[in-house]
Regions:
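Ubiquitin-like/PB1-type beta-grasp interaction modules and other compact soluble beta-rich domains
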Residues: 2-86, 90-92, 96-108, 119, ...
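Auxiliary tRNA-acceptor-end handling modules of aminoacyl-tRNA synthetases
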Residues: 44, 59-79, 101-295
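P-loop (Walker A) phosphate-binding loop of NTP-binding proteins
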Residues: 305
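Conserved glycine(s) of the Walker
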Residues: 309
Length: 315
């Protein structure tokens, strides 16, 4: 009734995809704006950049904006697609193996490396389990469920995630200092993802789930060929680095950002630094020993991103 008495003015959209401007009713979401734009992305729209910030298609427009609609050929769009797949997998695990703990370990081997563990059983993953999860994922996708968002007080969100066994997310929220928290909902499954999700599960067309080393690999589309999966790539050295990193996290008792924030709040920052330095010194000594056992080695190359400590390491 309020909106009919006081209609919102139209919003002007500067669409970067078409280099044109058009208007939409104030309060429209990005999905509506995409329909009104007349744009037809060949691989379907998954999200958008609004004033250069990634947003879900449920984002509402109340002011004039610069908008670029994205599909899975863009990095941001592919991340939206991948997060949505992760949520579907999390729901499948919750339904089939409610006592299991699913951990998204790393982006590895052209997909998402996942760990599945049980509190009171061995962690052997069988092909039958993988097949069951794959079938359940497809059932969830075929159900065309909406990815919904909700908001509640952070205290309520902490209680909710803790009741669901999502202790890592609960600890993270305890350290944010935010009064309210946004969360994601898929059917009766609740979770928390940092970033946008798709509108509905039926948009997930290309994916696979395979047994990979001691865990699972959630395969995702290839942005260069969106109708195909990313080709599998063996990355043994990278995989070993991640395994070592997780071992170090277990040693220090810091498996999540929430654990780290809590430790810092408890005044353990110096202890954490000292333990990390000791582990790193041991690793450097091991590398030096490997080099010493190669008398014909003439040059050692050190690679890494900007400001990662290459010069300091070389000394």
């Amino acid at each position: 009734a309020f909106n009919s008495l006081f209609p919102m003015p139209n919003v002007t959209i500067n669409c970067l995809n078409t280099a044109t401007t058009f208007q939409v009713p104030g309060g429209s979401d990005l999905a509506t704006a995409y329909q009104l734009s007349g744009l037809q992305l060949p691989n379907g729209v998954v999200s958008a950049k609004v004033n250069n910030k990634s947003e879900a298609l449920s984002y509402r427009l109340y002011n004039d904006k610069q908008v670029e609609f994205l599909d899975i050929t863009s990095g941001s769009g592919l991340r939206t697609y991948t997060r949505s797949l992760m949520f579907v997998l999390a729901r499948a695990v919750e339904q089939l193996y409610p006592t299991a703990r699913l951990r998204f370990a790393a982006i590895l081997s052209r997909g998402v490396k996942c760990e599945l563990t049980w509190p009171d059983a061995d962690n052997a993953i069988t092909e039958e389990m993988v097949s069951n999860l794959r079938i359940r994922m497809q059932q969830i996708i075929d159900s065309d469920l909406p990815f919904e968002s909700g908001r509640c007080t952070t205290d309520n969100a902490i209680d909710m995630f803790r009741a669901l066994g999502l202790e890592g997310k609960a600890r993270l929220l305890e350290s944010t200092g935010s009064l309210y928290t946004d969360y994601c909902r898929l059917g009766d499954s609740v979770n928390y993802f940092y970033g946008s999700l798709l509108q509905r599960t039926s948009q997930l067309k290309i994916y696979d789930l395979v047994k990979w080393e001691d865990g699972l690999l959630l395969r995702i589309p290839n942005p260069d060929a969106p109708t195909e999966l990313m080709p599998l790539m063996e990355q043994p050295k990278t995989a070993e680095i991640f395994r070592e990193h997780h071992r170090w996290q277990d040693i220090m008792g810091l498996t999540t950002v929430g654990d780290f924030n809590r430790a810092c709040a408890e005044g353990r920052a110096t202890e954490i630094i000292n333990v990390a330095e000791a582990l790193q010194a041991k690793k450097i000594a091991h590398i030096a020993e490997m080099i010493a056992h190669k008398p014909d080695c003439r040059i050692v190359l050190i690679s890494g991103p900007s400001s990662s400590g290459k010069t300091t390491f070389s000394k």
